A protein has these predicted regions:
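Conserved, structured core segments of small domains
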Residues: 1-82
Length: 82
């Protein structure tokens, strides 16, 4: 199991421009069984995604598809746990 902790690098106005695409990405990975839970941090400085993946390489591949990653919106800190 992994947790991705996202920290926004861009102003919230720019985050909001990519939010629907990010939500669509989340929906795809929930449907595939990759994601268990997700949501924004409070205060709104980023988000958290709990995911099920076979390896860190698989996590990196999934994160590479996130519009927030593609557009330089967020940094990702990945934590593996058992």
């Amino acid at each position: 199991m992994f947790i991705a902790i996202l920290t926004y690098k861009k102003p919230l106005e720019e985050v909001d421009r990519h939010l629907q695409a990010h939500r669509d990405y989340l929906a795809v990975h929930y449907a595939a069984g990759d994601f268990i839970a997700s949501g924004p941090q409070t205060p709104r400085v980023g988000g958290v995604i709990m995911m099920k993946a076979e390896s860190r390489a698989a996590v990196d591949s999934i994160i590479a598809q996130d519009p927030f990653n593609i557009n330089g919106i967020a940094d990702y800190r990945i934590v593996e746990f058992t």
